[in-house]
Amino acid sequence: MSDIKTYEYIWLDGYQPEPSMRSKIKATDEDSPPDWSFDGSSTQQAEGNSSDCLLLPVQTYDNPTFSDHLVMCQVHAADHTVHPSNTRAAAEALLSDEWWFGFEQEYFLTGKDGSPLGWEDGQPRPQGDYYCGVGADNVQGREISEAHLCLLYTSDAADDL
């Protein structure tokens, strides 16, 4: 049996005003994900003449689908300083002051044109009809939200799905 493990490294790119998620998979015999690098010029995080950026693992989760582990990363510059696109570092500094807050993930699925899926006029109806709804008139893209539920099977349970 092989001792090779796969780690899917996940990070936010440098696109503005809204960054996108990026990922790449590393196969290794190491028991925990090592630091890794990537070409920041392809993700709006570095100039082409000096494009190395570092991926520093923050948290690792068991992956219920493809690779062995999902590795949430923060980005640092090649000199190991916090990268400007790394908003996690600022949030971590703020949280060190013992603030309490929670996150609830609520989302709408949209088409490429930005309009919500499932509403003929492009605008959602009043919330009462589809809040916690079922059926084709009230729910679109259920397979995506069900895939989201796979988070329950990672090493840390999801909360408030």
Language-model-detected regions and their locations in the chain:
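ATP/Mg2+-dependent ligation/transfer catalytic cores
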Residues: M1-L152
